[in-house]
């Protein structure tokens, strides 16, 4: 059992489906909340940017951890929001089916053990030439109090 085993089973299930290569696959962990309009924002990013991976979670660790002190991001504007390149996210992310198929072995490799090593997985994917973008401000958040995506009153929004 465990989170990594569940995510591995999900990855294997999805990869066996007969989706179109351009279909958007969105993986969502069970401890995330989303702002209204998140579907439109995700589609906007996919349709206007063309990155490999997308996250609606503006992870707060990028703002305070010493390891990100010198982090440089490319800022991209779409019709209604800004996006930035980011080196990692959690297992709540989107990609096109063709991207998942291309990198499935990497996803599965980082699911070995009790927990998915999501940070290491995305930094490894980055090293392999893929990219990840995050909308700013975030349209989703981890619901742990110290992991909330900044600039949104999530407590008010989730009541």
Task: Indicate where each model-derived feature is located.
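Active-site-proximal specificity loops/subdomain of glycosyltransferases
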Residues: 1-23
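Short, high-confidence coil segments that cap the C-terminus of an alpha-helix
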Residues: 20-22, 50-51, 129-130
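Conserved catalytic core of nucleotide-sugar-dependent glycosyltransferases
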Residues: 33-107
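Phosphate/oxyanion-binding active-site loops and adjacent basic polyanion-contact surfaces
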Residues: 2-10, 34, 89, 113-117
């Amino acid at each position: 059992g465990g989170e990594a085993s569940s995510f591995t089973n999900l990855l294997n299930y999805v990869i066996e489906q007969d989706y179109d290569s351009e279909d958007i696959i969105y993986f969502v962990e069970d401890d995330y909340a989303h702002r209204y309009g998140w579907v439109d924002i995700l589609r906007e990013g996919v349709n206007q940017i063309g990155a490999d991976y997308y996250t609606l979670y503006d992870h707060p660790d990028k703002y305070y951890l010493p390891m990100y002190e010198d982090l440089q991001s490319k800022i991209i504007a779409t019709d209604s929001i800004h996006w930035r390149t980011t080196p990692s996210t959690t297992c709540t992310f989107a990609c096109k089916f063709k991207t998942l198929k291309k990198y499935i072995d990497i996803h599965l490799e980082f699911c070995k053990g009790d927990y998915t090593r999501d940070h290491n997985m995305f930094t490894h994917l980055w090293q392999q030439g893929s990219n990840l973008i995050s909308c700013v401000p975030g349209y989703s958040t981890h619901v742990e109090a110290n992991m909330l995506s900044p600039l949104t009153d999530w407590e008010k929004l989730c009541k």
